[in-house]
Each structure stands twice: as C-alpha cells, then as structure tokens.
C-alpha cells in the first residue's frame, strides 16, 4: 500500500513539472507565420512544396473583348485590309483611315472583280505596319487608250464600277498603243504603288479589249523590274466573271523613278500610298471592340499584362506577356508553410519554428511567443519580416520585365507555293515556344527556391540574434525555444524583441536560478523513464496481488485446482 501511494505521488509530481511555470523563469519561442491551407509550388529540388502564399504567373483567359485604349483599334467590319486599300465599293468608308491595329472579321466578303495577289501576305504586312491608307492621286498620262474601265461584277450602288485605287485601261477605237509612262519620287518618303494585269477568259475577250493577241506589262525602278504576261483562259466563274486580275505592288524610294511599259492588259495605278514605318499591325478576330484599357490584345480579346506569361493565344499585339504552353506557374511570395499542430505532446508547451509554424500571426511573418509570470503572449518581429518582404516584392516585377514583349507578334501567312517555308516557320515558332516554356518553368523554380531559402535564412538570423542577446541567461531548449533563467516580465520580453535587452542586468539572477533549478529539475527524457518504470511496477504489483489472492483462495477451499497428468 505504501509503495502504491509513493508511485502515485511520484507520477503526479512528474506531470506537474513545467519548466515555464515558475515565477523566476520564462520561456521564449521564435516562430514564423503559417496558414491552415497553403499553396503548392515547384522549386529546383522539389516538384511540390507548400508555401504560405503564391502568385499565379500565367494569364489563361481574356476579357472577351478588345479594348480601344491606349491603341487606335479600327474595326474592318466587312472588309479586309487589302480590300480597303484597293478601294472595294463597300469599303470606301476606310479611305484615309489610320490605326494601330486593324481588325479583320470572319464576316468579310468580296463584291468586286475577282482578283489574286501573288504575295498577299507581304503586301498585307507592309500596309498594316504603315498604319494608314493615306492615298495621293498622281497625274499619270495614258495616251491613246480608254481609262476607267468598269465591270458588272463590281457594283457601286446600282452602277457598274471598279476598284477606286486602280485604273483599268482598254483599247481606244481599234488601237492600243504601247504605253511608256514615268513617275519620279521627289519626296523624302517611300511610295507604294499598286497595279495589276488582266487575264481574259478567252482569246476573243483579249482582242476585244486590247486588240493585241497577247499583252505585256513591265514595271521597273532603278532597283527592280517585273514583267508579267497575261494567262488567257477560262476559269470557274465568280460573280459572273471567268477572267481574273492579278495585283502587284512596287515600292519607289526617294530619288527613284517608277517606269510603266505595256502594250495591253494593264490595270494602272492612280497614285501612291505614303509609306510609314511603325508598329501598327493587323489581326483576325471576332471579339467585340469596347471602351476599356488594355495594353495587350489577342484574337480572343484583350488580356491584362500584369503577369509575365500567358497561354491565351500565340498572336498578340502590344505590350504582352510571353506565350508559353503551361496553364499555370506559381511564384512563391511567402515562406515555407508548416501548419500549426493542434496537440503538441503530453505537456502542452508552446513550440518554436523547428516544430511547426504559427497560424493567426497578423503583425508579421516572424515573431515571438512567450510564457512568463504575467501569462502568455505573442508579437511579430517587424524588422525581419520587412527584410524578407522587401526582397520578395521585387520578384514579380523583375520576372515581368524579363519576359513581357514590347512589340507585336504578327500572324504568319504563306501562299501554297511557299509550303516548305511555312513548315520551317512553324517549326521555328514551335521551337521558340518550347524553349520559352522550359525557360519559364526553370526561372520560376529558381525564384521559388531562392524565396524559400531566403525566408528560412531570415528565421535563422532572428534566432541567432536572440541567442546572442540572451547569452548565458538562457538555455536553448531546442525546437526554436529558450528557457530564460530569470524573471522576465512583458517589458523584459519587449526589450529582447526590439534588441535593447542587457544581459548583464539579469546575469547574477540567471546564474543563481540556473544552479537551483538544475538541482531538482528532471529533463523530459527522465520523466518518460519514470513513467515507464512506474507503469511496470504497477503491473507487477497487480500480478502479485492477483497471485496472492488465488493462493489464499486455494488454501481456504474457495478455489480448487486440479492438475491432471
């Protein structure tokens, strides 16, 4: 009975031991912010690591409309850019228009004489980058021919008409003399001339319009020469026409001369388009144009450019994020997340950063929890928090600066005869996208690794700073906590936090308390041993009592035990 009482008292004494319960000591733990549910990011060393906060770097959706600010966006409606340039009857509204971005719709249609442009993509790109359809008529002299040819396939209102920027020349009477016309460029800018050649559907149509059985058109400058011969023959009818017109273009530099020579089939220029160098462009899109502000436009609509990457569309205009294949890339903007444990062992003591993070910290990423004679408390450390935030805040802006394109990514178009070039261009573009996608993932992983290492380092700096302040007045308990061997009220804790703690003031008291406490203090390891020993002794005593009861009962005859062999 005495043994049992002693064991009970010993067990109660062990459980009642708490290193921080005395009025002459205190416990100070250092910790960091944590959240219940963090965000997974990728680093160089880990595919998935949880952090307290992260920012998405990939813009994956558009706003569904094209913003008309800060760029001048011109809605082509039913006209392509080339149709507007040639002077289609239903595109007259676009004469002399200016734009930063010309939007071509899928609803475009043709209502004039059927034509083709052998180098359509190049002409479209040149006109688009010029950003204007500013046209100047010139006094070409076409002697001995009939000008202003018209076609029933090209109606302006109810009347037969033709492309307003071109002059269709046919015979005059029974003659079509050889034409030789020159036009110098005395200006200080490039001139773009549009001209063409008519391909009749039959020999009869050829002689009916031009007298000669076969015409010829030669257009030359000091730098170039083009000679085109008509291809006479029937073709599938378009708007009642089996003939075709091929459109060509010539750029005349300042000081150069345009020379036109023809003996038939000439579709002559009426003047020139003034060439300008700029970053205007053209884009095919059916997204509506609205009043809003966005510096990046895609065929899907405008997108914000506050992220370094996007996977909305390869084709962009303006200051846009870099296109990559990934749907998501997250940049760590917080520290490694270690959710707080709700139960921290048998004694319920406060814990430091080695064990877990602290949820609910609102005044900093790093901080202190303490337990002293005045109770318990928590406070953030603003200096270490600000040091980490300052280094992290610039990461997103630096990534955006490295990746945002300050130019437009134009659409690539090639004719069928340039199929091999188109395949090569596609291969190059796909390779660039693959390379950028890899670089983006690597860049983000490196930045995330740096962020986590940085925040861990700031925690360690704060711990070392606190340890150097306390010196021999405290003992490192492990887990990010210190046992302070002197009375340390809230003012004392505050001096440790703000770096004004003077360990000399408390040195004698701490040394005295350390020697007194160590004489009777049982470490947690010894407590565990005592608990196990007491448990074993209790089990042994129970067995002894049970065996003694059985032997007593057998002697009294209350229990009979038969052993058979």
UniProtKB/Swiss-Prot annotation:
Keywords: Clathrin- and caveolin-independent endocytosis of virus by host, Clathrin-mediated endocytosis of virus by host, Disulfide bond, Fusion of virus membrane with host endosomal membrane, Fusion of virus membrane with host membrane, Glycoprotein, Hemagglutinin, Host cell membrane, Host membrane, Host-virus interaction, Lipoprotein, Membrane, Palmitate, Signal, Transmembrane, Transmembrane helix, Viral attachment to host cell, Viral envelope protein, Viral penetration into host cytoplasm, Virion, Virus endocytosis by host, Virus entry into host cell. The chain crosses the membrane at residues 530-550. Glycans are attached at residues 23, 37, 53, 78, 180, 300, 498. A lipid is attached at residues 554, 561, 564 (S-palmitoyl cysteine). SUPFAM superfamilies: Influenza hemagglutinin (stalk) (SSF58064), Viral protein domain (SSF49818). Gene3D superfamilies: 3.90.20.10, 3.90.209.20. It is a single-pass type I membrane protein. The keyword Secreted does not apply. GO terms for cellular component: host cell plasma membrane; membrane; viral envelope; virion membrane. Belongs to the influenza viruses hemagglutinin family. Major glycoprotein, comprises over 80% of the envelope proteins present in virus particle. One of its GO terms (molecular function) is host cell surface receptor binding. Residues 551-565 are cytoplasmic. Binds to sialic acid-containing receptors on the cell surface, bringing about the attachment of the virus particle to the cell. This attachment induces virion internalization of about two third of the virus particles through clathrin-dependent endocytosis and about one third through a clathrin- and caveolin-independent pathway. Plays a major role in the determination of host range restriction and virulence. Class I viral fusion protein. Residues 17-529 are extracellular. InterPro entries: Capsid_hemagglutn, Hemagglutn_HA1_a/b_dom_sf, Hemagglutn_influenz_A, Hemagglutn_influenz_A/B. It comes from Influenza A virus (strain A/Equine/Santiago/1/1985 H3N8). Homotrimer of disulfide-linked HA1-HA2. Residues 1-16 form the signal peptide. The record marks 344-345 as: Cleavage. GO terms for biological process: clathrin-dependent endocytosis of virus by host cell; fusion of virus membrane with host endosome membrane; fusion of virus membrane with host plasma membrane; viral budding from plasma membrane; virion attachment to host cell. HAMAP family: INFV_HEMA. Palmitoylated. This is Hemagglutinin.
